[in-house]
From Swiss-Prot:
Pfam families (alphabetical): Ribosomal_L12 (PF00542), Ribosomal_L12_N (PF16320)
InterPro entries xref list: Ribosomal_bL12, Ribosomal_bL12_C, Ribosomal_bL12_C/ClpS-like, Ribosomal_bL12_oligo, Ribosomal_bL12_oligo_N_sf
Protein name according to UniProt: Large ribosomal subunit protein bL12
CDD domains for this protein: Ribosomal_L7_L12 (cd00387)
Record's function text: Forms part of the ribosomal stalk which helps the ribosome interact with GTP-bound translation factors. Is thus essential for accurate translation.
Family named by the database record: Belongs to the bacterial ribosomal protein bL12 family.
Length: 121
């Protein structure tokens, strides 16, 4: 049987919507396929566009008032004096991880008041 694409297209142009719906159903049944559009999986660029919910507070620089920054880090994290000093001395370093946006912004503001440079990741 010869396949005449132009004849098929001409036949489809003359068909009614009901005839075309029946044709689609018959093709789906005959070839065990679905005419439904595939649903794209979430992720990739769409995932990056989603609102971020967890933030890490990174101390990028202690500034000139290192003692005040160490005190603020101790208050925020509950670390001991040595651990807080090491964290500040080894900047850039993560002060706290997995905070919600409000808590991360509060901690950032508290550290910046002491003269530290802070970024949210």
């Amino acid at each position: 049987m010869a396949f005449d694409k132009d004849a098929i297209i001409a036949s489809l142009k003359d068909a009614t919507i009901l005839d075309l719906a029946d044709l689609v159903s018959a093709i789906e049944e005959e070839f065990n396929v679905s005419a439904a559009a595939p649903v794209a999986a979430a992720g990739g660029a769409d995932g990056a566009a989603a609102a971020k919910t967890d933030f890490d507070v990174e101390l990028t620089s202690a500034g000139t008032a290192k003692v005040k920054v160490i005190k603020a880090v101790r208050e925020a994290t509950g670390l001991g004096l040595k651990e807080a000093k090491d964290l500040v001395d080894n900047a850039p370093s993560i002060v706290k991880e997995g905070l919600d946006e409000a808590a991360a912004n509060d901690l950032k503001a508290a550290l910046e008041e002491t003269g530290a440079s802070v970024t949210l990741k």
